[in-house]
Design a protein with these regions (language model features):
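Non-catalytic, mostly N-terminal accessory regions of nucleic-acid modification and defense proteins
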Residues: 1-169
Length: 169
């Protein structure tokens, strides 16, 4: 599945969630999720290049420690957190921590804080949120040059969707 169809599929999942109302909210939801996913993959590269690299995101809130699917003993991909626990974790722990991150000593922390300052988690259904995360896990790999090259396609699609959102955005 290409990135554009993955984004469309994710938006279709979000349409089923009672908390997400309109394209503007779907785009906002997808933006912060993509940010954390892509940032995590960049951090993996930085860790490979520098063994002393320290993430500006508290360990508990890094994508790899709550969203990334892990293989069980049978080789099946499983979420680290159950749907019923996911929304409370995001709303009560992840968002407050990233909105209040001390950005005084790091430009990277400042970017993280700015991304989350005005962001919201609109999704209310943890199972649907897990379905979105699973799609991101399956399709978005920015270590792959082809995927990186298609990032512009994602951006263009999101802009077109936002334009189509009209006054809702």
């Amino acid at each position: 599945m290409n990135i554009s169809s993955t984004i469309k599929s994710i938006q279709d999942i979000m349409r089923k969630d009672d908390g997400v109302d309109g394209d503007a909210q779907r785009i906002g939801q997808l933006t912060w999720m993509l940010f954390l996913k892509v940032f995590e993959q960049r951090e993996e590269e930085w860790e490979d290049d520098n063994s002393k690299y320290k993430s500006p995101i508290p360990e508990k809130f890094r994508w790899r420690n709550w969203a990334k699917y892990l293989e069980d003993a049978d080789g099946k991909k499983k979420p680290q957190i159950q749907g019923s626990e996911l929304i409370p974790f995001i709303n009560n722990e992840l968002f407050p921590a990233l909105k209040e991150i001390d950005a005084s000593d790091s430009p990277t922390k400042k970017v993280i804080k700015q991304v989350f300052e005005d962001s919201n988690n609109y999704m209310k259904n943890g199972s649907l949120m897990l379905a979105v995360i699973e799609k991101l896990e399956e399709a978005i790999n920015f270590h792959d040059f082809k995927t990186r090259a298609h990032l512009g396609d994602v951006y263009e699609q999101l802009l077109n969707d936002l334009r189509g959102a009209g006054n809702a955005g």
